[in-house]
Amino acid sequence: MNKELLQERKKMIYDFICDELYVPMKAKEMAIVLNVPKSQRGELLEVLDALTADGKVEISGRGKYVKSEGKYLTGVFTAHPRGFGFVTVEGEEEDIFIPAAQTNGALHKDTVQITLSKNSSGKRKEGTVTKILSRGTEQLVCTYEKSKNFGFAVPDNPRFAQDIFTPLERSKGGVSGHKVVVEITDYGKNGKKPEGKVVEIIGHINDPGTDIMSIVKGYDLPVEFSQKIMKQVENVSNEVSAADMAGRMDLRDWQTVTIDGEDAKDLDDAITLTKEGDLYELGVHIADVSNYVQESSALDVEALKRGTSVYLVDRVIPMLPHKLSNGICSLNAGENRLALSCIMKIDEKGNVIDHTIAETVIKVDRRMSYTSVKKILEEHDVAEIEEYKELVPMFERMKELAAILRKKRMKRGSIDFDFPETKIILDEQGKPVDIKPYDRNVATKIIEDFMLIANETVAQDYFWQELPFVYRTHDNPDTEKIKKLGTFINNFGYTIHIGQDEIHPKELQKLLMKIDGTPEEALISRLTLRSMKQAKYTTVSTGHFGLATNYYCHFTSPIRRYPDLQIHRIIKDNLRGRMNQKRIEHYDSILPEVAKHSSEMERRADEAERETDKLKKVEYMEERIGQVFEGVISGVQEWGFYVELPNTVEGLVHVTSLTDDFYHYEESSYEMIGERTNKHYKLGQKVKVIVADTDKIMRTIDFRVVRDDVEPDEAVKDEASVLSKMTD
């Protein structure tokens, strides 16, 4: 039984059991009452088992099915390295805390049944795991350690706190220091450790590339494409055929450019821009990937499974094979390419007066880089201007229109968090040689503004057509978090207006503008960001809080994001007159799962990208132990405070390293205060730190504060002395 059918039948049977005329009955009795054929009674049992597992239905002492009285809840367990955990229950506003003594063998990501504790106090609900319904993890990436008679594997993920016992005959010949994939064969109970077997040796911890591959395996990121998919891709032509171009709007004589990073290979968006009188005509042309990825094909199934391309520090794990993403789907200069275009007429106030969405064929004139466009528009580089002289007027118009669009967006309340992204430079061996903030300049902003307006325009168009669609939504912040933020910023003389338990994004935008350039900017910006919710994919257009718009979608990157590819299919069905009732019902049935899965895969990719960045930052700072840097306090907790350096590297100053006083954490003001000296360490404060230690396994960096009255050279000597005592 497929997932959709199971959900449908679960609802039907649950409604039947909840009916006031229902009397408790056994499965066989229920089958007779509901006229379920004998051949389908196994499916009825499957549905009843699922309802029981969900905690919605219970079996009485007489074996009869009754509605659960709420004694049990079902959810997913999230473990903490210190032993306790939380269970996320659908429909519950907050996660339920599970003390370490009440986890009863549950491991990270397990689906569990819990009961609420009677002694739950305050706002936090507590519970006890009563049953493990299903295991969430079958394999783990570990560091293998071999002893004389057995081996054990230490999970990379600190949320799996127990080592896994691994008999030598199941170790695949692993030696100490090998990164391995371990399959759990016995999850252990009553204090017994889990047992497992090595199913893959990734490489030795000291081998180049092993560190990144360990993260890839740890997040279960699919690297290779199957032979079936590669054979399917081999049949795709390297050139656009006349048949493919037939019936499309021909824009090949329009002056067209792509603007991307120098190392980008999958070019999925191109731009055209003209101006007649008071109206700009902006064309955003997106690679027509759906022409080459047929719905429900092996390639499409794999693309949906992946959900997104993953951009790790040293490699890209693509959603589509490179032959497509870098070849026929990439809008390479001088080549005929199929596109889906959103052509907008925009007035001088940034209003979209009219628009056309069409299947097109384009030919890019020049492949531009952000650096080149920046040199032309900001640095007025003579050589670059001469090289691209026929395009310079269009670039000037782009700068002009982007500024208009940005001004309009900001006027309505769009929030722009200008936190620096990281660019990590690696050598040929994969070692980090430089770390710096990513350059956000006039060229990157032009593309950002043009993609945003295209995404908004497409979303609004399909919202009013009332067709099935996938939107990109961002819910309003949690009221309690916003109120807490409002209380905190009062300490600095700032206020935000919260009306009827809701806040308008313009209030947060005005706050960010007020704090721009102030000492408390980093502090308040981070707290504002933390008060907001995550954006996600949905089938209902509930608006995008951060962009202050009622309509938004992801239309512009079908090479690397599945939701974009999905809505391209919907748009083309509509343009071709195929959106009949059958297709509408089809999309209504599949889109909720597409949206949910795509959101999950996006979060997985983001986490993997963050972990590889953290790993390389640790590796970079490992070579700089003993060096002094100036940074800004970026986070304060009871165990210490975090310091971010100008190159975006972040490390912890542990409270135990602050030896000049006894410091306590003041949660209301996010600062550490010395009891004797009254010395303060607070968010946004500049401090000098020395690199004390690094840990590649935990991906952490330890800093120590350098006193203002100590010269850097002396600080290095003092630190070297401390380190030698620690390691002696």
Explain the meaning of each model-derived region.
Residues E94-P99, F160-T166, V649-Y665, D713-D718:
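A short macromolecule-binding patch
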